[in-house]
């Protein structure tokens, strides 16, 4: 999608929609929001909607970073403690590996 051809109010509307979509436990949408609108927020000449786009881009980046840290911590904790948690960990797993490393 080429957002450079869209008018500035449409860019703000898209950025806002992607920001609020990220609250539905979709941190990837926040990451896309940062990638698509970073140049609009920080590298383009000033325009009236730029401050709002900049705010949504910054909040999306913070949300993406937060989810990245939380998911990484959960993956490390689960992988290192899976066998110690016994049946509880098996109920949380889709694929149950044999034994432990």
From Swiss-Prot:
Keywords: Membrane, Notch signaling pathway, Transmembrane, Transmembrane helix. It holds the Pfam family PEN-2. Residues 1-17, 79-101 are lumenal. The chain crosses the membrane at residues 18-38, 58-78. One of its GO terms (biological process) is membrane protein ectodomain proteolysis. It is found in: Membrane. One of its GO terms (cellular component) is recycling endosome. Residues 39-57 are cytoplasmic. It comes from the Eukaryota. The keyword Transmembrane applies. InterPro entries: Gamma_Secretase_Asp_P_PEN2. Essential subunit of the gamma-secretase complex, an endoprotease complex that catalyzes the intramembrane cleavage of integral membrane proteins such as Notch. It probably represents the last step of maturation of gamma-secretase, facilitating endoproteolysis of presenilin and conferring gamma-secretase activity. Component of the gamma-secretase complex, a complex composed of a presenilin (Psn) homodimer, nicastrin (Nct), Aph-1 and Pen-2. Belongs to the PEN-2 family. This is Gamma-secretase subunit pen-2. It comes from Drosophila melanogaster (Fruit fly). The gene is pen-2.
